[in-house]
């Protein structure tokens, strides 16, 4: 059950959900994708992938009929909002179905960091323990398995929110090493800087605005260099920033991120807030393009910061200085580039990650009753006294029905 139609060429989230569905298909499982979202411009052709699809309605009993007739063994929710909307209907009509929550990233963490950034201070516990957090954690507890994309978020859920790790499963981006390019363009065949990201995603828009401040420092030392900014759905406020005179270029949507990434010498990702792990930085590793990023940008993506294929810094002037240095120094660039392959192979191998996920699903499915008995808090949250979202949905459905009479 998707939040939006998958757009693997527009967002890392779209790419991630497609890799999970392809994994399910490889097990000879029948996969259907449904969403209440309207058709989008860059959505993938699911039929071509061997995945059936249908549109569903929010707050409508038509979903009950649909899910009852389909009678799935497994239901995966794409982000916690979909579990809030449809989880109780799945529970009522298919109580035995294994419920998986694909968190994509912890929205509550991203929201808490954004609040702190706006007020120019460190994130506090009060920021983190918001109403949004309570909703997201409740959704995690109501599901049988929640997929967590970042090792940092795994630790946060276990240590801070005291969630039993038996209902969590670590699943970063999955990279098919057999399709991993054996060779990429060398240093002297690459030029310019680049960044990429869906403009509708708030942390990506913040990156563009922050790069506006950093770019003059870089351009001063490298007057012929350009910064190419790619991403889907650029709004007028973004295209208005396009400035050929200063080399600050808003390029917009691109069919293949890897093609433009491989032509660039460096990927710049000064990410100041967000959560999960960053698709642009994984793409940089795949194309063996060194990157300059922040602590939050690299968070959960490697175990040792010394092994980062580039530089990690939170200081604006240091960011610019390192970008200039790495852009000019071929030996240093090659040294950092070597870390790309090592990181991909040690953390993001789709064969290993896929095998572990299928193993977890089958294990829980075979022991579903005992697994649920161990999750008393989740059972309590599903109890009728706490299902406010269910009754709100039923009220809206009844109200809509009366409108149509």
Predicted regions and their residues:
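C-terminal amphipathic helix plus adjacent low-complexity
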Residues: 339-405
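Donor nucleotide-sugar binding/catalytic pocket of nucleotide-sugar-dependent glycosyltransferases
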Residues: 141-159, 163-180
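Short hydrophobic beta-strand element within catalytic cores of glycosyltransferases
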Residues: 280-283, 290-294
């Amino acid at each position: 059950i998707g939040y939006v139609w998958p757009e693997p060429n527009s967002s890392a989230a779209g790419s991630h959900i497609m890799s999970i569905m392809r994994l399910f298909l490889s097990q000879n499982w029948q996969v259907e994708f449904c969403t209440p979202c309207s058709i989008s411009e860059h959505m993938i052709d699911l039929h071509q992938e061997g995945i059936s699809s249908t549109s569903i309605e929010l707050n409508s009993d038509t979903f009950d009929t649909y899910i009852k007739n389909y009678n799935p063994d497994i239901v995966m929710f794409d982000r916690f909002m979909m579990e809030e909307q449809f989880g109780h209907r799945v529970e009522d009509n298919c109580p035995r179905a294994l419920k998986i929550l694909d968190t994509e990233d912890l929205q509550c963490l991203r929201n808490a960091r954004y609040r702190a950034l706006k007020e120019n201070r460190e994130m506090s516990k009060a920021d983190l323990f918001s109403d949004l957090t309570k909703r997201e954690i409740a959704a995690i507890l109501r599901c049988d398995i929640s997929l967590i994309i970042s090792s940092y978020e795994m630790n946060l859920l276990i240590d801070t929110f005291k969630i039993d790790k038996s209902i969590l499963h670590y699943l970063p981006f999955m990279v098919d090493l057999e399709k991993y390019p054996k060779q990429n363009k060398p240093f002297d065949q690459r030029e310019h800087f680049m960044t990429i990201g869906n403009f509708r995603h708030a942390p990506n828009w913040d990156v563009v605005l922050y790069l506006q401040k950093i770019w003059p420092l870089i351009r001063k030392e490298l007057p012929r260099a350009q910064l190419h900014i790619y991403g889907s759905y650029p709004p007028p406020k973004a295209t208005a920033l396009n400035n050929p005179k200063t080399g600050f270029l808003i390029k917009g949507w691109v069919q293949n991120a890897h093609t433009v990434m491989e032509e660039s010498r460096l990927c710049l990702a000064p990410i100041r807030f967000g959560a999960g792990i960053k698709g642009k930085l994984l793409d940089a590793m795949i194309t063996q393009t060194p990157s300059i990023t922040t602590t939050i940008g690299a968070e959960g993506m490697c175990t040792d910061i010394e092994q980062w294929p580039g530089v990690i810094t939170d200081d604006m002037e240091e960011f610019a200085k390192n970008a200039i240095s790495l852009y000019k120094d071929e030996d240093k660039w090659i040294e950092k580039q070597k870390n790309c392959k090592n990181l991909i192979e040690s953390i993001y191998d789709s064969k290993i990650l896929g095998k572990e996920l299928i193993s977890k699903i089958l294990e829980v499915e075979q022991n579903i009753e005992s697994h649920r008995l161990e999750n008393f808090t989740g059972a309590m949250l599903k109890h009728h006294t706490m299902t406010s979202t269910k009754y709100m949905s039923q009220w809206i459905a009844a109200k809509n029905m009366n409108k149509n009479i």
